[in-house]
Structure formats: C-alpha cells, structure tokens
C-alpha cells in the first residue's frame, strides 16, 4: 500500500523576502481568499503568523476601498 506524501507548506512571503504586503496588489490577495470571499487560514496556506496578520489587514483594507468584494455569492 502506497502512502500519500503531503508536501510541506511554506510561507511564500518569507521565501520571497517581502517587507510588507500591499493592499493594492489584488492579484496576490485573491490567492488568499475563497470563492465566497473568506480569508483562507494560515494552517491551509502555510503563511507565517506575521504575514497572516499583514495579509488579513491588507484584505480588509482592499475590501473597504472596494478593490475586493466582501462576498461573491450574491443571490
């Protein structure tokens, strides 16, 4: 029986040496929100605590400025 090998998660922001996450970088921020508009937790993305806080702050600022939607499921 073959075992499933789970790939180790790593923080992309630490690896790239990002100083601060910019709220105007919508392409990057969209990778960290779900289809329904929720912020993806760090245990799933592998983002470190420092950058997860910056990410949440940037997403909330972008939402406030209408750069990102609060939700995509309008019915």
UniProtKB/Swiss-Prot annotation:
GO molecular function: small ribosomal subunit rRNA binding; structural constituent of ribosome
InterPro entries, A to Z: Ribosomal_bS18, Ribosomal_bS18_CS, Ribosomal_bS18_sf
The entry's keywords: Ribonucleoprotein, Ribosomal protein, RNA-binding, rRNA-binding
Function (record text): Binds as a heterodimer with protein bS6 to the central domain of the 16S rRNA, where it helps stabilize the platform of the 30S subunit.
NCBIfam families listed in its UniProt record: S18
Family, similarity comment: Belongs to the bacterial ribosomal protein bS18 family.
Protein name: Small ribosomal subunit protein bS18
